[in-house]
Amino acid sequence: MSEETATSDNDNSYARVRAVVMTRDDSSGGWLPLGGSGLSSVTVFKVPHQEENGCADFFIRGERLRDKMVVLECMLKKDLIYNKVTPTFHHWKIDDKKFGLTFQSPADARAFDRGIRRAIEDISQGCPESKNEAEGADDLQANEEDSSSSLVKDHLFQQETVVTSEPYRSSNIRPSPFEDLNARRVYMQSQANQITFGQPGLDIQSRSMEYVQRQISKECGSLKSQNRVPLKSIRHVSFQDEDEIVRINPRDILIRRYADYRHPDMWKNDLERDDADSSIQFSKPDSKKSDYLYSCGDETKLSSPKDSVVFKTQPSSLKIKKSKRRKEDGERSRCVYCQERFNHEENVRGKCQDAPDPIKRCIYQVSCMLCAESMLYHCMSDSEGDFSDPCSCDTSDDKFCLRWLALVALSFIVPCMCCYVPLRMCHRCGEACGCCGGKHKAAG
């Protein structure tokens, strides 16, 4: 691969986790570390094409941390088969190649799964199906622009007395409305001296200026009907105070996109508050702040300074101080286990499913559920080593009855397995009451 692929940019990365890269050994029917054991930095990223047509290639790259050796490098495709066997082990299949990752925590596994899903969505929506379709769409757009520009020119230059010397200009690249209007205004002023009138005794200069103003008003009307770019008379855009600017973490945005689907009500109040804040103008006189003014003439009155659009911005090189947290809904932090935001006032036991739960672990060991999982892995797993949860009540599974019969038979050999169901029900009641389960832990 090229150096650009090897050193992917942070803006083009979808996920970056630490895991052990595994490969499938068909001879033994198990998974072995790829390229030797060791923790690797695995990244899902894209490499845009240089043609700038919106297409890109998506890769999964694994680099071992101890010696910087590339142990995994594969390109993502639409026909990817992704399996989540356990919370800390996922594997996928591309063509005839099988790879897997053993993660350090379930949060890393979910972050990698979200990155894979986003990459597959971008692969499905990113590029057109064929090059001929893209060229056909460009030709159709160019023909529409040619027809519209020819109608404007015929309407504007239908006077026979005007002698034009304007060079030919291709209509494939369409200028902006303001640039086109300014260019034609200069053209009108330059052509005013070439207009001749048959009646002597009239002021040629005044007639020329009237003609120019009339053509400019017609051109403004045509631009309004075609482009429909409304402009406000005066618009003031100002920024908040330095202490009220909130620093945005790109990782928070990356994780928040998929968290919104699982917890849509969590961000509803924040979005409504952001919309309300966007309509409020903050104005604070400060001599240290630098403002830049950009004026753009109005469509109907080009020479009027009152109808100019004024944008006030601050230089981007200004250092931003630490943000002040909002106190309306309590202090919110991000959990280090599930990467979700939580409120400290509502953080009780049972809120985080990925946090360490010693009671649940004790129930798992006392009831000897490891024996049940071992039996299902060796007797009822598929070719990829996947098997259903031992106590799953999903009747759509084709081995539902056989699995429960095997568990009942195994319970006669290991009687302590019968304690799992009542203990697990008591544990769930404790989670509902806030007495059992894991709690969120703030990052940092």
Curated annotation (Swiss-Prot):
Check the record and name the InterPro entries matching this protein: KBD, PH-like_dom_sf, SPRE_EVH1, Sprouty, WH1/EVH1_dom
Kindly provide the PTM information from the record.
Palmitoylated by ZDHHC17/HIP14. Phosphorylated on tyrosine.
Q: Which Pfam families match?
A: Sprouty, WH1
Q: What are the UniProt keywords, alphabetically? A: Acetylation, Cell membrane, Disease variant, Lipoprotein, Membrane, Methylation, Nucleus, Palmitate, Phosphoprotein, Ubl conjugation
Q: Where in the cell is it found?
A: Cell membrane; Membrane, Caveola; Nucleus
Gene Ontology terms, MF aspect: phosphatase binding; protein kinase binding; protein serine/threonine kinase inhibitor activity; stem cell factor receptor binding
Residues found modified as Phosphoserine: 238, 308
Q: Where is the composition biased (Acidic residues)?
A: 135-147
Q: Does the keyword Ubl conjugation apply?
A: yes
Q: How does it sit in the membrane?
A: Peripheral membrane protein
UniProt xrefs under CDD domains: EVH1_SPRED-like
The UniProt record lists the SPR domain at 334-442
Q: Where is this region: Required for interaction with TESK1?
A: 333-444
What this chain does, per the entry, is described as: Tyrosine kinase substrate that inhibits growth-factor-mediated activation of MAP kinase. Negatively regulates hematopoiesis of bone marrow. Inhibits fibroblast growth factor (FGF)-induced retinal lens fiber differentiation, probably by inhibiting FGF-mediated phosphorylation of ERK1/2. Attenuates actin stress fiber formation via inhibition of TESK1-mediated phosphorylation of cofilin. Inhibits TGFB-induced epithelial-to-mesenchymal transition in lens epithelial cells.
**What disease association does UniProt give?**
Legius syndrome: An autosomal dominant syndrome characterized mainly by cafe-au-lait macules without neurofibromas or other tumor manifestations of neurofibromatosis type 1, axillary freckling, and macrocephaly. Additional clinical manifestations include Noonan-like facial dysmorphism, lipomas, learning disabilities, and features of attention deficit-hyperactivity disorder.
Q: Indicate what this protein is called per its UniProt record.
A: Sprouty-related, EVH1 domain-containing protein 1
